[in-house]
Amino acid sequence: DQHDMIKDILNLHNNGLPFELDTTFSIGNFYQKNGKAIIEEPLYKFDMYPQIDGVQKLTFPLPFCDNSIQSIMFDPPFVISKGDSLNNGNSRSNIISKRFSSYESPLDLFISYDTNLKEYYRILKNDGILVFKCQGTVSSGKNFFIPEWVMWRAYHIGFYPLDRFELIARSRLISGKVKT
């Protein structure tokens, strides 16, 4: 599962230490399983929409000096959605985008990801690590191969993509528009 994968990444590439910074902390469920802490929380916690005490509002530039952070976890939204279905009152539609957030267009997603990558490159130490949790997505019937784009873009910003982990989904949320 994702928790085991993250623990493996931390052990392999961060000497078993916790992340120093998470800019997509939300309420910290990522660090828990069934209400039990299984991954140590980061020292610095940020989110676009802080929901709990101890989480700071994400603004750019981040309040860190250049080359000052050892490790970053980034688990951004991946859903591209807009329109009436976001506010139609149906609790079974747009589950992910309602729980976290979404981008209105593919361009918005790419701009956001690019902005974050550049800022992380600025604040990460030379031997620091960025864990960018992402997945491909579909919008308006078009596939967007996000992990491949992130690797390409990170490389062009100056990162060295050291590793890639893939978690295979056992199930998928399917749009209500799809008839099976």
Question: What are these model-derived regions, one by one?
Answer:
Residues 1-180:
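Class I S-adenosyl-L-methionine-dependent methyltransferase catalytic core
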